[in-house]
Each structure stands twice: as C-alpha cells, then as structure tokens.
Amino acid sequence: MMRRPPSQGRWSASHQKLLLAFAFILIPWLQLADAQQQPQQPQIRIHSQRGDAPLDKVADDANTRWYATHAAPDVHPEAKFDTVNRKQKQQSTASPQQHQKYRRAPYDYASKDKAQNRYAQHPIRESEKPNYVKVPNDASALATLAPAQPVRAPHTSRHHWPSSSAASGLASPQNARSLEDWEVEDFVLLATVDGDLYASDRKTGRHLWHLEVDQPVVETKHYRTNNSVLDDDYRPVDHYIWAVEPSRDGGLYVWIPDSGAGLVRTGFTMKHLVEELAPYAGDEPPVVYTGDKKTTMVTLDAATGRVLKWFGSSGSQVNEAESCLRPNAFDDRDTTECSSMGTITLGRTEYTVGIQRRDGRPIATLKYAEWGPNTFDSDLYQQYHASLDNHYITSQHDGRIYAFDKSQAENDLPLYTHKFSSPVARVFDVCRPWDANAGSNPELVVLPQPPIPALDESTVKMRSNSIFLNQTESGDWYALSGRAYPLILDAPVAQISRDDLWDMAHAFDSINPNKLSKALVGTHFLNPVKSTGYHQPPTLPAGALDEYYEDLENASNNAHAVTNTVPEEPTIITKVKALPQSAANSVIDFVSNPILIIFLIGSLIYNEKKLRRSYHRFRTHGTIKDVYPFFVIESEAGDESGDDKDGVFPSSPSPRSQPQDQNAEDHLSRHKVERNAGDQDKVKDNRSLHDVSDTLEPSNKTVEKTADVVKQVDVAGPDAPSTDSNGAAPEKKKKAHRGRRGGVKHRKGRPTDGSQSHENDPALTTVDEAVSNAKKLGDRPSLEPDVMTIYNDMQAVTGSVISMGNIEVDTDVELGMGSNGTVVFAGRFDGRDVAVKRMTIQFYDIATRETKLLRESDDHPNVIRYYSQVQRGDFLYIALERCAASLADVIEKPYAFGELAKAGQKDLPGVLYQITNGISHLHSLRIVHRDLKPQNILVNLDKDGRPRLLVSDFGLCKKLEDRQSSFGATTGRAAGTSGWRAPELLLDDDGQNPAAIDSSTHSGSHTILVGDPNSLSNGGRATRAIDIFSLGLVFFYVLTNGSHPFDCGDRYMREVNIRKGNYNLDPLDALGDFAYEAKDLIASMLQASPKARPDSREVMAHPFFWSPKKRLAFLCDVSDSLEKEVRDPPSPALVELERHAPEVIKGDFLKVLTRDFVESLGKQRKYTGNKLLDLLRALRNKRNHYEDMSDSLKRSVGSLPDGYLAYWTVKFPMLLLTCWNVVYNLEWEKTDRFREYYEPAGL
C-alpha cells in the first residue's frame, strides 16, 4: 500500500549511491546536534511496557517449540520462528520542554519524508484478489488460510516506538501517550454489516485490499413456531422483532407488535447485556437472558491486508515470515530487506445473547461481532473526539459512503462517493507515531472515527429520533441510528410508521410475515415525547442510561458543526452542466429496469395470439375494416376460454385423464371444424358454448360468463365420488382423483374451446336464443352431489375481490390460516358477511367430507353454518358463517375483543354448556370431531348481547357407520393437535402397547396408571370419548384464562404428561363456590380410560351447570326423601348417606355454623353435629322458614337462593356432589322426583 502518490517514487541506482555517501558524511553531525539539544534518552520498547515479565522468555521458548511442530511445511526451517531476547531498559526522566523539542525535531520530519519515498515504490495492484479469511476456532486453521507469498524472508524483530512520556520505565503508556504524537495514515479501514473489512485510500476512496470474513456482524434468529394468535401457545413476546445496531457495542432495539410503541430503543447494548446483565430471569413475563462473549485478535499487514497473527481462546498462530516483501525483488534479488508500511492490530469481539421463556422455549438468539481497536490503545481512543485531519466518512442506508473534508467550512461537497454491497458499519482511522523511524515497521493504531457532528440542535434531535431498520440477505435484522449514521435521515420512511398501513390491518397477526418484513424496512421515528428516555420492553429490566448513547451525543456535540446530509449542487450552473449526464443516466436506468423488461416480455407473451392474428390480417387483407367482426369475436371468446383452460383444467387432480397432446388438439379445434355424422350428439352437448361465442357481440359478456360458470361446474363435478342409481355411495378403493372420476366417460379429448365456429351447426340469430341456451345448461344435474351448482354469472376479478356467483372473496382481508396452505378470507354470500375457506385442490377429498358433514350438522345453533362451495382454478372455496373471533382470541387477547370477553365472563358455565351442546349434536349424528381446541371454537354475539359459541373446522371429523362405535387412528399419525389429543390417540400414534408402559409411573394425587389394561377400549381403538377428553382441556382453558392442566411446569411436556396422566387442577380453586364441581367434572373428563369418561349428555347434566336455585332445590329434595327412611335400624339409603359424612362434615357441622344461626336452629328441633342427615335437615328447615329469620340473620346467611346456598357450600364444598352421587348410587335418578337432575340442564 502506498502512502504517497507514485510520482514520489524511488530514485535511480546512481542517485541512491550519491545519497548514501552524503548520508554517511552527514550522520555524525546530526548526532552531535541532537546531543546538544537534549540529553540522551534511552529507547523503551512498547511491547516490553505491555508486560515483559520474567516469564516472557519461557513463553517465547514455548512458542518456538509449538511453532516448530505446527508451522506450514513450505516455510524454511530458519524462518519458522525467531526468538528475540528481550532486555528491559530503564527510561530516564525528561522534562516537558525536552519532550516538545524531541517531538518537533527536524529529524522526525526528514525521516517521515524518507518513509514517504520508501513506500511510494510499492503501489497496491488492483488486480490483487481479496483475501478470504475464515476466523478459525483453533490456531492451526490460520496456516491453511494465510495467503502464500512468492518471496519469503526471515522473521524480523519487533520494532518499538520512542517514548512520548517522561515517566519511569514502569509507567503505563495509557497515562503517558498523547494523541498529538500521532498522525493519520493515508488510508482508512471500513467494516461492513456483512462482516468484511476494506482498506480504501483516505482521499480518493480507491480500493486497496479486502479481507473477507465468513460471519456477518449481526445475526438475529427468531423462533416463531406459532405464527398466529390462534395458536394455543401464542405469547406476544414470541413475536418481538429484535434488531442490533452494528456500531459501538451493539445497541439493542425491539419492535413490539400491537403495543402502539413501534420500534423501541431498549437502552441496552449487546455488551451490556452479556457483561453486566446476563444471566437474568424475569417474572413478568417469564423471560430468561443468557449471554457469552468471545474475543479474538488479529494482526494484519497494512500493505496487503494479510493476516500475520491470530490469537484466540483456543490457541494462536503467527505467520509473520510470510508477509515479508522485498522492496525491489527484480533488481535486488540478493537483498534481504523487507518492505512494510506497518502492522494493524484489530480485535474482534463476538457477543451472543440467548432469550428464552422460562418454560424452556427459545424466543430469539442475537449475535453481534464487532471489529475494534486494541484495548491497549484505549488511552488514545478516549482522546479521539474529532478526526485529526477533519476528514469524515459516513455511510448511507444502501451501502453508499460519502467522504467530507471539513477543514474548509465553505466546502460542503463530498470528496468522493463509493458503493458497497452492504452498509458500512464502522470507519476506522489508522494512525502512526510522528517519530517513527524511516526504516521501521511500526504497529499502527486503529481508532474508530467519530460520527460527523450535527449542524444544530434540531438536527441533533432528528438524529436522536430516527432509526433505520433493515434486513441482511440472510434475514437478520439490524438498525442504523441517526446518531451514528447521519445520512439515514434521507432514507425512505418505513411503511409501518405510517398510519394508513394500520388502517388496513389493525392487528399484527393479520399481516402476512413477508408483508410485515417489507413494511418494517425503512426509517422509524421514536416517540418524541419519550425520546429523552430509553425504554425497556416488558422483557427487560429497567436500567440506567446506556453510555453508548451518551458517547454518541457527546461525539456529535463536541466537534465542529457540519452538514449531516449529502449537499445539493450550490449553483444553477453546476446543475445545468450535470443535465446531460443526468438524462443519460435516467435513460440507462429506465431501459435497464428489470421490471420494465419483465413487463414487456409478459405483454408480448400475453398478446402473442393477437399479434399473430394482426400480422396475418394485414398480410392478407391489408386493412382492419375487412376483418373487424371476426377479430373482435374471436379474441374475446378466445381469451376467456383460454383463461378457463388455464385456471380449471390444471386444477384437476387426475393427470391420467388428460392426454399430452391435449393442448395441440384444442389449438387445432379452434381453426378446423371437421365433424362426422356420428358426432352430432356430442356437438349438440357442447354447442352452447360455441354458439354463444359465435353470435354475441363483444358488449354482451354476461352470456359468456354464464357459460364459463357452467363449464367450471362440469369440470369440478367429476372430481367427486360417483353415486349409483339408488344414491348409495360405492365403496372407495382409491381416492376420488385417481383413474376415472365420478362415472364420467374416459374421453381422450376435452370439450372443445368456446371460441370455435362451426360451419355445420345452426347459427343462433338472436341474443335471446343464446341466453336461453345458456340458461338451459344449468338445468343439467351436477355430477358432484357435494358441490353446489352456481347459476349466477361468473364475475371478473376486480382488484382483491374475486366474485364467483353468489360468493365474493376479499383476498386482502385474511381472517386466519390453517395447515397445508388453507387460508380463511373475508367474503360475502347473497349479501351477508361470510368467511370463505380456501383450500388447495389436492385436499378435495377432505373438503368434500367436511362440507358433507357440515350439511348434516349445521342445523344447530352451536355448530358453524355452511353456505356454499365452489371451485376456481387450483382452489376450493367454502363459504361459512362468519364469526367475530375464536375462543383463543377472546381468552388470549381480551383487550382486543372486550365486548365478547365481558359477555363471556358473566356466564362461564353457559359458554361451556354451548360448546358441549354442539359436540353432543355431532355425537348424536355419529360424528367425532377429533380436533377440538380453542382455535376451532368460534364466538359471536347474539342480538341480546349474549355470546354464542360454535364448533367449527370439520376437516378431521370422522363419521361412524351404522353399528360402529369406534375407529382406528389415522394411518401414520393420529389426528388432532399436539397437546389437545386424548391419551389413547398418543399411545396408538406411538405404536405402543399400553400394558407395556411402566404402570408404576405416577406423580401426585392426580396420577392415572397408564398400564391399566382397561385404559383403552376396543383394543386401542378411539371412540367419541376422545372429544370428551379434548373438551375437558377446553373447559380448563376457559375457566383459568388460558392455562393447560398438563403443562405441569413445562409446555413441551404436555403430551408426555398426558401419556402418564399427570395433571394439575389447582388453578380452578380461584372459582370459589364452583371450584369443587368444576374439578370433579374436568377430572372425570380427563380420565385415561375412555370408558371412565362421561358422554356429552352426562357432561351437560353435571351439577356444575346448575343454577343456584336448582342446586338448593336438589338438596332440599334429597333431605325430604331421606327423612322418610327408616332410622332404627337405618335403611340402606341412610347408611349410604352417612358413609360420606366424615369427608363432608369433617367433625361437627354445628361448630362451623355461626352462633346466631345455631341458636335459631334449637327452636325447632335438636341436631347432631356429625350426622349428614341432620345437616341436610337444617339446610331445608331454614330454607323453608327463611322469612321467619331476623333481619340480622338474613344478612348473615345471604339472600335466596344465591347467598343462602353459598353460606352452606363454602363451609361444606363436597355437600352437593356427595348427595348427587348418593342419589345415583341408590338408583333414584330414574324416579320422577330426581329425573330432571340427571338430564341436560337446558341452559
């Protein structure tokens, strides 16, 4: 690398000899003059000051032995390693005046000029290939990566700098060195976001060398397995977007969806998180931060960028011998002189921050690797507040850099500009000591260049509030702040920062991830009200103001005011001169625009037929007038039929039914009309499509669209299973889309295109006849009984709305997403709002089964209503009842669905009863849902403001045939969603024998022995009971606001806990009076044995759903019935009742009741405190004599029926269920008195 222009090159050989003789005479006089100016000052090696301890000799010997065994084989043995004996010298004290004389001595400047001439003879060749360096994990890796040199020389000893301090020999250089002793080199180092390092000429921007690294500066990995709020494990923190600023310790930013805050500056850096914060575990939300730090150091040859040394925690590598270059290898081949501009020592620090939830699920992994100076030079770095020569280089958001010379205040034009593949993250000024010897190889100092200072306070504020967010090619997010990168103020504003984006999509979950990424790229503006503080998202602790931002502000305010944007041309003359070049650039950009090229090519392909016909017309007729009718009719009909062929025929799942030469036949059929007499029937069957095209004018498009719809139905129909004459479905041995389809004759050709004209067909003379024929097409019976035939006109696609007869689909409004490419859009059907479920054609069988089951079951208020189905192109569209939200939406985001959430909280038993009622309706039709979860339960509000729950998503439903009570699991893997499936499905899914599982595995009081041979019914086959198990999970989810009984500390252990039967119902205790009934019901529904679970009607009859009035009436009826039993000896009914007394009363119930209530009891009859019969009698008597109680006692026991019932159930929570089970055990549930208590509550 050259430090001065090539014109100052080496002299000739004769001149060199004269100079050598002159120097030989002059040197003694220079030494004498120097001795007269100041006392002799011993030179001290800088490296010895860095810690030359007595162990250095041992270290050098060890390095010699290591290098001898690990050096590259092509290195000469004498050049492998050269151990230099270090002798520590003492430094004499010098006064400040002497120091000034030494620093400004004429010898320094003369030696500097000599150094300029010396380096000028070795310009860096542009053809030199960039070095690719992969930062190794071990020391031996560097030997294979270091570039080979054609000329090698022995290792030179370390060079030292003269001391600039008057301190003693033990003084630290950090306390002695001054930045005034240094000058900037003629090149700068540029570190880009992709991790590479460039060296460029400081004044011209010419590229000198390039060091490639395989690791980018920023890596952000987000773990988003749940992409929708409909997922059961959705948490807002999972959707935070983290970004790292690639400058000054890695400032951390986070974009928080649905918070209104947008992009937030956390006030933390990667360095701070790793070194001071991590490990950190928070509680709200439960998030854990961990971090680690890895440092490496490399020494580069300043002239070539080659790696000389590498030091890391795993080892080190020294390849200095390979960097030696002879100054003139062609002329002085025998010389051993090495030429070098010096060496550069750079540190690379890698920070890794792991962010996980406390349940072990990862949220994000952030990595930041920054180039930085040697920490030993921190004393100079702390003094470096402004560029030494007032030259500044800064980068735009697109990777273009600008260089400014601020030594002249009136000149605001950039010196040069250069474009890099990625933005420049950091700029490093390279400095060398003023007093470096001419022949020395000094260690250059790298200092990060301060940012360009702001022009005024308003500019400082704009910088502080502006953040540019972007992604690398690998999808990692990084941020560029206006403080560190002033030119990002000219970057485009991010779409998401505008209000109009959120007008289209209010919820973060409704935005497509790709669209969200595009919307986030651009400039974001921090809240100006909060810009003075640094905000921590809910996952981070509140901390002090980060030094990162303070330093940037100080760097901006302490320097001279300069402009912060790329300046415009100062005069109109310069603008006029630039017009020709600007116009040429615009034309070149326009012509080379890939979008324009793609558009032109697409237009040519799309209009190929029209262009051919036009060319043929002009060749044949010469004018357009002669052939105008033929041209218009043929093009219109041909275009629509062409669209139909492309949109419908490829969607057919039966490639066997379409010959390879089909397109050729269709093409020929549009130009050749040759038919035999025996084909007249086929012509009549298809004639309407051709006749309509042949007779209608271009303005009459409705008939063409009608024919298009009929054609679509004819094509879609054969894909469904066929039915025989009696309507019975034959047994399917293969899927419907294999082989011959639905009884349709296996024709080699397809129906001819609608744009044909037929000479043998009778022409339609009027439009009315054409319309009449088109209408008659709809009278033909559809071959697919599960697809509704639509007779209305097929509308064209206008914008994002697709009209298909009665169905309109707005593809811009996405309501939800499912598996296998299923998307739910907003739409309309016959004027009412509907949800349109779009499925790919590959899942035709699933859609057909779903619609058949929907038709059978939608006549119920708690089952989703089905409207219609239509096929278009490669998709099937199913119109369903549209709901406001799913149950998961309401539970997880009550703030977004406040009205629904409030309505549901008022009557939780009613909500759960409706869900059970819908499942009971399906079970009554012998339909098993198999995928019951909160996401598949939808919520709407009735006109009276009450919530209405609907069971939806019948894609995995299974209908049991007559006399069938069970079925096997799905081949390959059991149906359902992970975490919401019954244990018998999991066991069948694993292919395990339940009896082979360890039956001794248990945990807590809720353990179910999986090894019980009765745990599975029908030899491991599933029944309706799998829906009851999932329903129990839904019950717990609703009553606990989103919890899962099988989490047991870790969500990822759900299915393991389901297999083992480990669940926890303690969170239900928060329900108060209803807690015991809720626990009993859910525990019965979560039984491992399907036979032990109640059916849907038994669930609906459980006392949990009873009103307080019904509960109190039941207890009084039980007391009345038992009072009639014989007491001496006690009847079996009394024995059964009193058997449960100890666990219900737990002692003496009279001691539990209040004193005034017990005193009021004594007026009627005597009571025994340990008798359950007496407790029921007391409850019944005071209920019947409630009006006889005093006002104070009424206030004590509460009002009827709610307060009075709670007075007893709070003290005796097991009372109601115990009596309910006693009556059942006595078989009284069939009597007239108790029958209503064992039938569905009918809420």
From Swiss-Prot:
SMART domains: PUG (SM00580), S_TKc (SM00220). This is Serine/threonine-protein kinase/endoribonuclease IRE1. Residues 90-99 have a biased composition (Polar residues). The active site is at 931 (proton acceptor). Residues 70-132, 149-172, 638-765 are annotated as: Disordered. Residues 73-85, 674-693 have a biased composition (Basic and acidic residues). Residues 1-35 form the signal peptide. GO terms for biological process: intrinsic apoptotic signaling pathway in response to endoplasmic reticulum stress; IRE1-mediated unfolded protein response; mRNA processing. Residues 163-172, 650-660 have a biased composition (Low complexity). It catalyses: L-seryl-[protein] + ATP = O-phospho-L-seryl-[protein] + ADP + H(+); L-threonyl-[protein] + ATP = O-phospho-L-threonyl-[protein] + ADP + H(+). PANTHER family: IRE1-RELATED, NON-SPECIFIC SERINE_THREONINE PROTEIN KINASE. The gene is IRE1. Residues 809-1105 form the Protein kinase domain. Glycans are attached at residues 226, 470, 554. It comes from Hypocrea jecorina (strain QM6a). Autophosphorylated mainly on serine residues; phosphorylation enables nucleotide binding by the active site. Residues 36-585 are lumenal. Senses unfolded proteins in the lumen of the endoplasmic reticulum via its N-terminal domain which leads to enzyme auto-activation. The active endoribonuclease domain splices precursor mRNAs to produce their mature form which then induces transcription of UPR target genes. Residues 607-1243 are cytoplasmic. One of its GO terms (cellular component) is IRE1-TRAF2-ASK1 complex. It is found in: Endoplasmic reticulum membrane. The chain crosses the membrane at residues 586-606. Residues 1108-1240 form the KEN domain. Mg(2+) binds at residues 936, 953.
